[in-house]
UniProtKB/Swiss-Prot annotation:
This is Large ribosomal subunit protein bL12. Keywords: Ribonucleoprotein, Ribosomal protein. The keyword Ribosomal protein applies. Pfam families: Ribosomal_L12, Ribosomal_L12_N. It comes from the Bacteria.
Length: 125
């Protein structure tokens, strides 16, 4: 009687991890193949650059420069973050400062507009 694939699978399931690694190495040597190549083929083709460039959904709003009107920038940062006056002043003077992390696109754009209206330079990352 021939050994079935299910018999082999059951035998491998009972082996320790080290024994399975040894078995894979022996199969690679015997058949002249690489298990890594088989995994890559099974995974399918790699996505092209167009597919890999998915649109970001979360943005970090970074204050790059407070501009000429630091008081307006401090007020805008306080309103956006809820920081106290001293903390907001330190943040504005210590640019670059991440005002908000992982904001939605709409929220990040609105915050950027608010800070730019106060005279600050802002980046979305």
């Amino acid at each position: 009687m021939a050994i079935t694939k299910e018999d082999i699978l059951n035998a491998v399931a009972e082996m320790s991890v080290m024994d399975v690694c040894d078995l894979v190495k022996m199969m690679e040597d015997k058949f002249g193949v690489s298990a890594a190549a088989a995994v890559a083929v099974a995974a399918g083709p790699v996505a092209g650059p167009a597919e890999a460039a998915e649109e970001k959904t979360e943005f970090d709003v970074v204050l790059v420069d407070a501009g000429s009107n630091k008081i307006a920038a401090i007020k805008a940062v306080r309103g956006a973050t809820g920081l106290g006056l001293k903390e907001a002043k330190d943040a504005v003077e210590g640019t670059p400062f991440t005002v908000k992390e992982a904001a939605s696109k709409e929220e990040a754009e609105a915050l950027k507009k608010q800070l730019e209206e106060a005279g600050a330079k802002v980046e979305l990352k």
